[in-house]
From Swiss-Prot:
Keyword field contains DNA damage: yes
Domain LysM: 39-90
GO BP, one annotated term: DNA repair
Chain coiled-coil ranges: none
Highest rank taxon of the organism: Bacteria
InterPro entries, per database record: Cell_div_suppressor_YneA, LysM_dom, LysM_dom_sf
This protein's record includes keyword Transferase: no
Function description: Inhibits cell division during the SOS response. Affects a later stage of the cell division protein assembly, after the assembly of the Z ring, by probably suppressing recruitment of FtsL and/or DivIC to the division machinery.
Protein's recorded name: Cell division suppressor protein YneA
Organism taxonomic ancestry: Bacteria, Bacillati, Bacillota, Bacilli, Bacillales
């Protein structure tokens, strides 16, 4: 079979498969790039992962133990110890953290 004969017979299928491949690549890039919406917080003196869990676990819809495990895993904290001045990523979407902070700020005015 020549290329012309293959194209004439299967052009709809070829276009469909190529479209699916392109859309799949776009979808994969979108999903991989969308993982950056988690908040980053600075650790203060005397803070621990459990203190961060007390403060933020309610905004993440996770149990405190799950929150601590997630933070340890995502921030590569083998012993679960954090030091003052460190930044850690927490499983709270940036929009949730900003909304709650602005509400508190408005209430204080």
């Amino acid at each position: 079979m020549t290329m012309k004969l293959i194209w004439d017979k299967f052009y709809v299928s070829i276009i469909f498969v190529l479209t699916c491949i392109v859309l799949g690549i776009i979808l994969m890039c979108t999903v991989v790039g969308g993982g950056n919406d988690y908040s980053e917080v600075n650790v203060s003196e005397g803070d621990s992962l459990w203190a961060l869990a007390d403060q933020y676990a309610g905004k993440s819809d996770m149990a405190k133990a799950d929150f601590v495990s997630w933070v340890e895993k995502e921030n590569n904290l083998a012993d679960g110890h954090v030091e003052a001045g460190e930044s850690v990523v927490i499983p709270v979407h940036k929009t949730k953290l900003i909304k709650s902070d602005s509400t508190i700020q408005l209430a204080n005015q």
